[in-house]
């Protein structure tokens, strides 16, 4: 009887082991197929990566082929976890950047900030650019860009405000600020702002970086630190590059506000800076 029990136990043990080995084998096959088809690739080991473990990931160039014009190789760069910030390289094509600028140019006005008590726009010396809003879903190209933003962020398109196009000339800037609200008035429509997608529509010869002065990291460890302006060296900074998009979160994963998301636009020293911002809310944003 004891022998029979032992035999059954051994049979069950071998059966479980074979099942586990089979599952591991199938998982390996699936991963190899995903790699072969370019759905994802292994992290690239870059000798120039900094001690903060900047990570680089490749997207298949064919994964997001819709839109105006042809985009270059798309890849994602992890900048920081405090705040959560990522750069999507070649997020927009050159033609899409130029299209947004051409739509906005005839309607540019002096940029304002939101009054926390009334919710109305007001002039402020902390923001010296010019800008305009493009209504959400106003045409096919805008819809395509907004859908792309939704696909990358997993935030529905109807949670976003209209695209804001901004223009900074030499000397113009935006002092460090938060995109989230600290009042109840501005959260009535859509709730709190949870994330921002900042798309660069032009290159900038010098200056104009997006800077995070409260980021929890060693600012000087990034490979491009020596290329930054004095303003850019005061925090974690991203240099404007046509077609790139910077995504950062104003809220932590536990839904609390993230003070490390403090950010600003450094003064443009040489050239012009064009950008487009999409603010995304916790709930549906009605327009």
UniProtKB/Swiss-Prot annotation:
Kindly list the positions annotated as binding 2-oxoglutarate: 273
- The portions of this protein that span the membrane are 17-37
Q: How is the cofactor bound, in the record's words? A: Binds 1 Fe(2+) ion per subunit.
Q: Which UniProt keywords apply?
A: Dioxygenase, Endoplasmic reticulum, Glycoprotein, Iron, Membrane, Metal-binding, Oxidoreductase, Signal-anchor, Transmembrane, Transmembrane helix
Q: Which residues lie on this side of the membrane: Lumenal?
A: 38-287
Sites binding Fe cation sit at: 177, 179, 263
User: If you read the UniProt record, what top EC class would you report for this enzyme, in one word?
Assistant: oxidoreductase
- Do the record's keywords include Transmembrane? yes
Glycosylated residues? 218
Q: Which cofactors, if any, are listed as required?
A: Fe(2+); L-ascorbate
Per the record, membrane topology reads: Single-pass type II membrane protein
Stored Pfam families: 2OG-FeII_Oxy_3 (PF13640)
Protein's job: Catalyzes the post-translational formation of 4-hydroxyproline in -Xaa-Pro-Gly- sequences in proline-rich peptide sequences of plant glycoproteins and other proteins. Hydroxyprolines are important constituent of many plant cell wall glycoproteins such as extensins, hydroxyproline-rich glycoproteins, lectins and arabinogalactan proteins.
Query: What name is this protein filed under?
Result: Probable prolyl 4-hydroxylase 3
Q: Which gene encodes it?
A: P4H3
